[in-house]
Amino acid sequence: MSIDPANDSKLAPEANDATLGDVDRWIEQLKKCEPLSEADVEMLCDKAREVLCQENNVQPVRNPVTVCGDIHGQFHDLMELFKIGGDVPDMNYLFMGDYVDRGYHSVETVSLLVAMKLRYPNRITILRGNHESRQITQVYGFYDECLRKYGSANVWKHFTNLFDYFPLTALIEDRIFCLHGGLSPSIDSLDHVRTLDRVQEVPHEGPMCDLLWSDPDDRCGWGISPRGAGYTFGQDISETFNHANGLSLTARAHQLVMEGFNWAHDGDVVTIFSAPNYCYRCGNQAAILEVDDTMNQVFLQFDPAPREGEPVIARRTPDYFL
């Protein structure tokens, strides 16, 4: 699945004010888990916005590609993911949201992924998760981390403004539909997703909210979500949606699964979770999904990266996660 990066060696044309050298320097700095300066974050977000605003609500993605679930600020595990799956730009990646909150290094994690997007716009796709929102990040850690590392909320504002431009979903070779959460009773076609106005804070209800918050369920039909946003949807719903839209699979993230991936709805839906030992205590494996150039699918599972300088937390499984 290695790809010759020669055709993607130039910086996104919209990002010419940030030189190739600038962005390469940012990436190397971030790979050492060293946060960028506030001024560099501002420039990064300004230039990344110019790239992301050109992308679609249903962003087309070519194979081969590696599909990833939640990261949640677990920076060293993101480095492990690239070690297992291959580095950018040698491999194509599709991340399905939730880069921030809960982990210790949300700033470095989201900065690196956005810098990679700016440097190699055709090699990496970054979708929006329910945690890429102003309201959620004020509760679950990213806001506080920005205050602690920068002394003000400016970096948080730069990133949360940028989150409004992240694509909502992606479509691999017209066959695999990828999104953070799940389906919506308001949406029966990909064309409907394409018409949504995504450049806004994640709403509390409605189709955009549902795409980022919903979960598959064993019960048929639509159900009330215990999360307080989105819906649960049954096998009948996903089967109908996939068939109506010519899809072979809906891939999503959003839920902790102990093996890193979990099939549901008789193979119509798969959940991918890419944060091993979630919250540094859950004991789960992580996984990524490799889709090759013939659309064959292989899951790669991985364990946490060795930890340095982080507190050891006794493992326990919380009752519920957002």
From Swiss-Prot:
Reactions catalysed, as given in the entry: O-phospho-L-seryl-[protein] + H2O = L-seryl-[protein] + phosphate; O-phospho-L-threonyl-[protein] + H2O = L-threonyl-[protein] + phosphate
A GO term from the CC aspect: cytoplasm
Keywords tagged on the record: Cell cycle, Cell division, Hydrolase, Manganese, Metal-binding, Methylation, Mitosis, Protein phosphatase
SMART domains: PP2Ac
Residues found modified as Leucine methyl ester: L322
Top enzyme class: hydrolase
Species: Schizosaccharomyces pombe (strain 972 / ATCC 24843)
Name this protein carries in UniProt: Major serine/threonine-protein phosphatase PP2A-2 catalytic subunit
Molecular function, one GO term: metal ion binding
